[in-house]
Each structure stands twice: as C-alpha cells, then as structure tokens.
Amino acid sequence: MSSAAENGEAAPGKQNEEKTYKKTASSAIKGAIQLGIGYTVGNLTSKPERDVLMQDFYVVESVFLPSEGSNLTPAHHYPDFRFKTYAPLAFRYFRELFGIKPDDYLYSICSEPLIELSNPGASGSLFFVTSDDEFIIKTVQHKEAEFLQKLLPGYYMNLNQNPRTLLPKFYGLYCMQSGGINIRIVVMNNVLPRSMRMHFTYDLKGSTYKRRASRKEREKSNPTFKDLDFLQDMHEGLYFDTETYNALMKTLQRDCRVLESFKIMDYSLLLGIHFLDHSLKEKEEETPQNVPDAKRTGMQKVLYSTAMESIQGPGKSGDGIITENPDTMGGIPAKSHRGEKLLLFMGIIDILQSYRLMKKLEHSWKALVYDGDTVSVHRPSFYADRFLKFMNSRVFKKIQALKASPSKKRCNSIAALKATSQEIVSSISQEWKDEKRDLLTEGQSFSSLDEEALGSRHRPDLVPSTPSLFEAASLATTISSSSLYVNEHYPHDRPTLYSNSKGLPSSSTFTLEEGTIYLTAEPNTLEVQDDNASVLDVYL
C-alpha cells in the first residue's frame, strides 16, 4: 500500500474528473465493489459458523453480475462483471476477531458512495475510503494478491496470538473481472482518520537512498515526506512517556520479526503527526466530503484499530503529555523536541512485498552503484534490524525522568557541607585541646632549652645541644597532625597556622636557629573568624 494515498484526503474540486485503472473507469470499479461485496457478505451470513480449516484459506467463490440482473443479483448500469471472493470464511473470522459485524461491514462499504483519494501511489493503484472513515480499499497487483493468499495461514496464526498489532489488518480480498481485465482489491483498516488533520505525514523505511519527497509531492496540499525529510524536520525525534515508548517498541519489534519470518521487506511505517497546539489556534474548514458519516462516528466499530490500541497502550496520559480528551481519535500522545503536544497515528504498510528473485536482483545492482546498506530493498533480516534501529534511535525516544533542579541541588549540598564542617570543626577542636595541653606541659623543657642556648653564647667552649632525631620527628608529627591551616593574609612574611581551640587568642612561635628550636608566645591581635581561635607560627 502506498503511503501517498494514505493521507486521508479526498480530491477537492476534482469530483468530476474521471480516473481510469486498467482502462476501467473508477466509478465502475466503485460500483462493482459495492455490488459484489454486498452480495458475497449477504450470502455468507446464511452459512453456519464453524472453525476455520486449512482448506478454507484457498477457497475462491465466484458470482456473475449481469447488468440486467439475475435471480440472485440485482440489475445495475455498469458493464457485466464477475466478482470473486477469496477465502470468505477465513476473512469472516478476521472481521469477527476485530469486532466487525456483517451489518456494520455492509453499512460502511455499501450505504454511501466510496470516496476516491486524491493521491495515488507510485504503483498507480487506486485508493478509496468509506464514508464513515473505517476502511481503505486499494487495488493491488496480481503478485501482491497471490502473496496475500499464501500469507493467510500464517497471518491467521499471528492475529490469534497478537490481535494488537501495527501490521495491516486485512478484512477482505476480492477480484472484479470485466472485459478480460482482472482488478484485484483488498479491504484494510484506515490508518489516518480524515477527521483529524495531519500536519505532517511521513513514509519511513529506515533507508536514506533517494528517501526524500519529490518536488511534485511537496507541491500537494498534504504531501507525504520521507526519511531524509523527517531527519531534517524532526531531527531530535518524537518523545513518549516510558510506558508508551516501551509498548510501542515492543509492538514494532514483534511485528518486524513476524514480517521477517514471512521473508517480507521493503515495508514502511506510515506516520501521521497532529499538532494539538496548532489545532487550538486554527479553525479547520470541513466540508461534507471531509467529515465522516455522522451517523456512525459516535463509536469506534473496529477493535484494535486505533494507534493507541494497536501498541497495547493503556490509553493513559503519561507524564502530563496530554490531558484526557475524547477527540483524540485514538492517537498516541507524544511531544516534539520543542515541547509541542502531538497526537501520532501510525501503521506498517506495504507488506505484500516478498524477497523474491526480482528483489534480490534489484538489491544486487543497486549495491554495486550505491552503499548496499543504505538502499531500500534488502534481505528481510537486515531490513528488519535497520528498520528497528532507525525507529528506536532516530524517530521514537523516551522522555527521561526529571532531575533535581540546580537550586535544590545547591541547597542540599550547602546543608551537607555545613553539617560536615561542623563535625570536622568539633573533632579538630577536641584534638587541639589535647595537643595544646601536651604542648604547655612540654613548654618547660623548651624553656630550659632556651636557657641552655642563651648560656652557650657566653661560653663558646660549649656546643649547643640539639634535640635527638626521635624528639624532632615527634615534634614534626605533632605539628602535622594538628589539622592546622594557613592564613596567607597574616601581616608578616611568615605563614601563620590556626586551630579552632577554645580559650584566649594567642601566638606561639617555633624558631630553628643553628640547630636549636625556640618557642615564644605572645597575644594575638589578628582578627580571626572564630572567636575561640589561636595562632601558631612556625619559622624554619
């Protein structure tokens, strides 16, 4: 499925322009779809319900609808055509799994004319949307329809295990035959609701090779941008609360592994972004063609069809991203890197591409010219890993838990420093008390040492006594362990040492001259921050 056609916008002012597909007018295709589905679903309701068997996946029912009508079919003004239904019982089970009742299915498709979307895909497929905005109908190629038939048993098993998925939800596969032309169509879920304006739409593959919207695409009213455009516009990515982010990545990982097991690659993530802040400021002009059927929009008929349901999200507004709003249409709440509130709508599209021989050849010749890891077409395992890495690292990001503000940190650190400093001061004060008492006790020995030194000056025949190495080491240890600090602003050329001891301020001086240590003490006139401080000067 092409992302360009998923914008959910009908062609404004071009209702009279008739398009053709395989030389068949689009109006004839729409009419045949409604007539054929109306007949086959109505006929299926008469069959008893039973378990799906393996052979049911390969059953093809056919009915001929002539323009003049028949006993089983109504008359119509389109050319005669034959309508085929593939695996009707299997698809009936799929519809029941998603809560789609036969009456609702018929009402959505057959009650009102189908709306043709203005943006056809690169493959030239036609896209129609039902008037109630529930279903997308797309024309597919023969190989795509054939691949979907082969995929059905595994698809059935996967849906049983995980009905909540971002993979396309297929509700029917049909074929219209007229004039020797086969037109195959598939009915799927509508990823982007038309009633919610998409300010940006992206088709993301995780590739960089030619992944930028063309000039022609950019000129459209609602262009679909690509990977390089996203990296330029949303370079910081999209942010989710932790719970939503984990649910989204878990769903993407599981879906990619399923596609890898089916050898599917070249798929895309169709991403629609709605800015809530913009929608509050702007008044969107809605015409009856852009507004879904008011009779049916009171409730969502299809289960697991919204983006929020598809990722197993709880539907809560995490981390204050978005307030409870009934008009969110099931979008996933997120924020831009600028803090803007967003609603995201997404789904994996274009899964009917298997890694067949032609794709292998396409990758081979592209890899010869360009970097093989950057091209879109790649082997399924590498494609899945690259796709997930791109989504996880460049597109979707988790909002980190709020950290404490700097002011709070500063207050806490100051309080801690105050408490620590009080403990240190108290400890130093007690230590200095003890050491001061010891120094005063030892002062007498220093006094006698002074007298001996003075006497030696008058008696040159005597050699001044010097303290032993043990005493000198003891003194050095006492001074170094006293937790002193230096005041460089002391008005002398010598450094001054302080301690926080109680008592009157005083100054004591140790002087080493000619191998003799002198201790002098004098009152301290220096203003110290602590009233109970004393000064100890050491001159060496």
UniProtKB/Swiss-Prot annotation:
Catalyzes the phosphorylation of phosphatidylinositol 4-phosphate (PtdIns(4)P/PI4P) to form phosphatidylinositol 4,5-bisphosphate (PtdIns(4,5)P2/PIP2), a lipid second messenger that regulates several cellular processes such as signal transduction, vesicle trafficking, actin cytoskeleton dynamics, cell adhesion, and cell motility. PtdIns(4,5)P2 can directly act as a second messenger or can be utilized as a precursor to generate other second messengers: inositol 1,4,5-trisphosphate (IP3), diacylglycerol (DAG) or phosphatidylinositol-3,4,5-trisphosphate (PtdIns(3,4,5)P3/PIP3). It catalyses: a 1,2-diacyl-sn-glycero-3-phospho-(1D-myo-inositol 4-phosphate) + ATP = a 1,2-diacyl-sn-glycero-3-phospho-(1D-myo-inositol-4,5-bisphosphate) + ADP + H(+); 1-octadecanoyl-2-(5Z,8Z,11Z,14Z)-eicosatetraenoyl-sn-glycero-3-phospho-1D-myo-inositol 4-phosphate + ATP = 1-octadecanoyl-2-(5Z,8Z,11Z,14Z)-eicosatetraenoyl-sn-glycero-3-phospho-1D-myo-inositol 4,5-bisphosphate + ADP + H(+); 1-octadecanoyl-2-(9Z)-octadecenoyl-sn-glycero-3-phospho-1D-myo-inositol 4-phosphate + ATP = 1-octadecanoyl-2-(9Z)-octadecenoyl-sn-glycero-3-phospho-1D-myo-inositol 4,5-bisphosphate + ADP + H(+); 1-octadecanoyl-2-(9Z)-octadecenoyl-sn-glycero-3-phospho-1D-myo-inositol + ATP = 1-octadecanoyl-2-(9Z)-octadecenoyl-sn-glycero-3-phospho-1D-myo-inositol 5-phosphate + ADP + H(+). Disulfide bonds: none annotated. One of its GO terms (cellular component) is plasma membrane. The modification Phosphoserine is found at residues 445, 447-448. This is Phosphatidylinositol 4-phosphate 5-kinase type-1 beta. Keywords: ATP-binding, Cell membrane, Cytoplasm, Kinase, Lipid metabolism, Membrane, Nucleotide-binding, Phosphoprotein, Transferase. The keyword Chloroplast does not apply. Residues 1-21 are annotated as: Disordered. InterPro entries: PInositol-4-P-4/5-kinase_C_sf (IPR027483), PInositol-4-P-4/5-kinase_core (IPR002498), PInositol-4-P-5-kinase_N (IPR027484), PInositol-4/5-P-5/4-kinase (IPR023610). Interacts with RAC1, AJUBA, PLD1, PLD2 and ARF1. GO terms for molecular function: 1-phosphatidylinositol-3-phosphate 5-kinase activity; 1-phosphatidylinositol-4-phosphate 5-kinase activity; 1-phosphatidylinositol-5-kinase activity; ATP binding; phosphatidylinositol kinase activity. The lineage of its organism: Eukaryota, Metazoa, Chordata, Craniata, Vertebrata.
